Structure formats: structure tokens, C-alpha cells
Swiss-Prot record:
Subcellular location: Lateral cell membrane; Cell junction, Tight junction; Membrane; Cell membrane, Sarcolemma
Extracellular side: 1-48, 92
Transmembrane residue ranges: 49-69, 71-91, 93-113
Residue ranges that the UniProt entry lists as topological domain Cytoplasmic: 70, 114-356
Cited function: Cell adhesion molecule involved in the establishment and/or maintenance of cell integrity. Involved in the formation and regulation of the tight junction (TJ) paracellular permeability barrier in epithelial cells. Plays a role in VAMP3-mediated vesicular transport and recycling of different receptor molecules through its interaction with VAMP3. Plays a role in the regulation of cell shape and movement by modulating the Rho-family GTPase activity through its interaction with ARHGEF25/GEFT. Induces primordial adhesive contact and aggregation of epithelial cells in a Ca(2+)-independent manner.
Glycosylation sites: N2, N30
GO molecular function terms attached to this record: cAMP binding; structural molecule activity
Membrane topology summary: Multi-pass membrane protein
Region (Required for interaction with CAV3): 93-115
Region (Required for interaction with KCNK2): 136-186
Protein name stated in the entry: Popeye domain-containing protein 1
Region (Disordered), start-end ranges: 313-356
Amino acid sequence: MNFTEPSPLAQSTVVGFLPELESLTPVPSNETSCENWREVHHLVFHAANVCFAVGLLIPTTLHLHMILLRVMLSIGCTLYVVWATLYRCALDMMIWNSVFLGINILHLSYLLYKKRPVKIEKDLGGVYHRLFEPLRVPPDLFRRLTGQFCVIQTLKRGQVYATEDKTSVDDRLSILLKGRMKVSYRGHFLHNIYPCAFIDSPEFRSTQMHKGEKFQVTIVADDNCRFLCWSRERLTYFLESEPFLYEIFRYLIGKDITNKLYSLNDPTLNDKKVKKLEPQMSLSTQISMLEMRNSITSSSDIEDGLHHFLRGSSSTASLPMSSPQQRASPKMKPIEEGLEDDDEVFVPVSPAHQLP
């Protein structure tokens, strides 16, 4: 058997590596390498972390939650930059915290810009405080609504806003700012329109189902009037992109149509009186509103239905009648507005429930 003897060069190489291998001491994997803890950092470091903790503990229900959070984060990043520069001498920590500080300052500036007081024009202040502010519409959103595609127009006394069977209802939607307008149909006076009320809300609702219609009434300025006028098409596109404002308009227009129905029953009723009488409308008012709705909806022609209601109202108004509060029986239940059918208003009593 042949044996190969190691060369002297290989032996010297192995012997040379032995001292280096002996100097290496492996670290067990189940023990920590932090045997000696370093000293506690400077107070500035702890103050920065306290600011971060306070910012994260701010409740989200607080109105200025995001602003306070960004303020505390900005203060904390500033203290970190000071600590890394003066006490740690760490360039990388200073750079990263400077970047975080810049981001927080930019976001804080944006939040403060959004919270700035928005100035509303004097002519539009009454409309905002009366209609939109109670529904929590922000001033900046109202300014967007009234600043892009609407104009303020004027009408002198006697000038016509819309003529029945001639003026298209597809062009505009308006709110009266100042003055008073008179609405009539075939020469019959219907009701007045007062400030902070929509001029053509029924027509706006009808055009959502049918296009190309004409005004069924004539609207004339009974005084020098100023009104806010939107382009119907552009307003529709804007409301489609703002679901919140879309629901606000649906509510306001529905309420305005209801007030106009009350005014049909009493032409001298203004907006303030309607607001006071809404919780306690008399029985005759509710009956006349149901008659008007049924007359219009049951007729194939809207003009014939409204004309039939006007003739019935004028004939009944000429008869001497006592106060409805005096004639109404205390056992009679009030009629709900949601009932649209006359057959559902008065329900016959079953013989089983009649007294012997």
C-alpha cells in the first residue's frame, strides 16, 4: 500500500492558521450579545418619544385630532434632529428625522389651510345660514357650489321669470335672495315666493323624469328681486360627483315643494308662518293638500287636474264655513300626509266593532 507523505509547505500552512482559529470564540445562539448595556440617552431623546406617545393617544373623536397629531409628531421629529446632531453625532438619524419633519410640516400646513375661515358673499350669507348651515354643509363646499357655475341675476317689478307653456324648465334652478315673486296659473293666483326659497323646485323635480317640458305656471316679480341661478345641466353633473350635496338638495327641494303645497291652501302664508304651523297643521289644510295631490295625479293632464282643484277651492271658499278647529270632532284622527289615496283616508268601521 502506497502512502503519500504531506509536503512541508502544507504542514507550515496548517500550523500558521492554528493560532487564528484558537482566537475565535463562537457565540452561543441562545444567549444575548448585549452583555454590557450602554448608558441612558440624553433627556432630549426621551422628550421626543413622549411627544410621539402623546400624539398617538389623542382620541379620534376630537375635532382637531389630525392637527394635534401632526403638531406632536413635528415636535418629536424636531427633538430627534437636535438629539442626533448635538448628542449622538449621527448623520443618518439626523437626515431621516429631517425628512419626517418636513412631511409632517407639509401635512400640518394643508390641514390648517382647510380650517381657514371661508368668507361667504353678503348676498349668499342668508341662504347659507338659513338652508345649508343647519344641515352641516361646510362653508368651503358651499362656496364651491355657488362659485363655479351660478350667477346672481335681478328682475324688476313686473318682469317675468317664467311664462306658462313657453319657458323651458330644463335650463336653470334658482333660489330667491331678495324680494317677492307671484305664481299664477291661467290667471289664477296660486302663491307667493319669498327669500331663501326655490323658485322652480317642482319643475326641477319633474325634469328628473321627463325632459323638454314647459312651465305650467307663470312666475312674475312682485318686487325688485335678486336670485341665485344655477345652470341645470352643470349643477346635475356637480351633484353626481358630490353625493353629500346631492342628498342635501333632495331634502331641500322636497321641503320647498311641501311649503308650496301649504301656500296653495293659504296664499297669504309666508315661509315663517309655514315653519310655525308645520307641527300643528289643521285638518282642513291636510284634506285640501290631499285633494290637490289626488286631483293632479289622478288626471291624465296636469293642467286639467290643477284647474279642477282650483275651481273646487274657489267654490268651497265662497261658502260660509266655520273654523275647522271648531267643527272637527275630538274623536277624529288626523290624516297622515303619506296617504295618497282618498279611499285610505276614511276607513269604514266594521260592524263587529260597532256598539249595540
